[in-house]
Every structure is written in structure tokens, then in C-alpha cells.
Amino acid sequence: IPGGGGTKEFALRVSDELKDGQIDQNVLKDRFLTIAMAKVSTSGAEAADLGYLKAGKYSITMNRSRLIADAKTKALELADAGYTQPVRRTDIKVLGKSGLGIVYAGANSMFAGNYISEHDKKISEKLGYVMCGGDLSAPSIVSEQYLLDLEREAFLSLCGEKKTLERIQSIITKGKPLRN
């Protein structure tokens, strides 16, 4: 799972996308699958569609040779405008056990159908655990720090698994993911 705040960011975006009267689990499922299936964007527009870019907080450079220059210009504009890091949020809605049920049921059915390995199932469950805010009995409001702590715990526990280390080694040595 992403270990540098990426899972927290997707949980935050799920929270921002929830609307009254909407089925919360559908929003969670869409964002969960983006990470779980390791979807990669092939363009800036696709990255926005997948939720990797925050709405209204990005610009897309079409000419690859302009990437560095455009990034530098944007960074200087932000610095000149007095940009500071946003205050960490404490108003993130997570689904708790109701969301976890969806994640675990999906992981179990994918495993039973031989679409994913036992280790894939474990990773999916850890990812869902973080995105749902842990083992909370009901939908709750949590902070970014709470989600970051869950993410770090899940990431480090997976890093201690032999199968995870084998996957990392496969990526480094062969350039391909290992399905173990």
C-alpha cells in the first residue's frame, strides 16, 4: 500500500466526495480499487480522472520538454504568493466496519475465484483497513494524523512479511511484480 501518505490522501478524497443521499460504499469502492489494482495513468487528464490530482489544484503540461520549466514557474508563483502548508484536517469521514465489510467481502470473493493470491488478499484488507479508518464500529470523523498513523502501521507490518520482500526484490531485479 502507499506508505507516504497516499492512502490517507485517498481516504480524504473519499470523505470529500461523500454526499447526502449517496451510497457511501460506492465512493469508497471506486477509490479503493484505484489503489488496490495499482492503476497507472498515461496522461495528466487520466491522472485527474483516477483521483491522483486534486480538483482545481493542478495544471497539465502537454509538452514533456516543458515539465521542469512549468514546475519551476509554478513553485516560484506559490512561493511569491506566500504559500504555506495547509493546516491538517480533523474532519475526515471514514466508514469504519460498514466499509470494511465491503472490502473484506470483495477480497474474499476475489481470492475464492482465484483472481488474487492470499498475500494480495492480505494487502487488500490492510489497504481497506486504513481507508475505512480502522476497526471503528460506525462511520466516524477522524484526523489526518490518525489516518497517517494507521497507514504507517499497515505499511510497516507488510514490510515485515517475507512475501512483500520477495515482491520488492522482484521489482528491483526483474522490473516485474511477483504474484506470490
At which residue positions do the language-model features occur?
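Glycine-rich phosphate/ribose-binding loops and adjacent secondary-structure elements
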Residues: 1-17
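Intrinsically disordered, low-complexity segments enriched in small/flexible residues
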Residues: 12-39, 43, 55-180
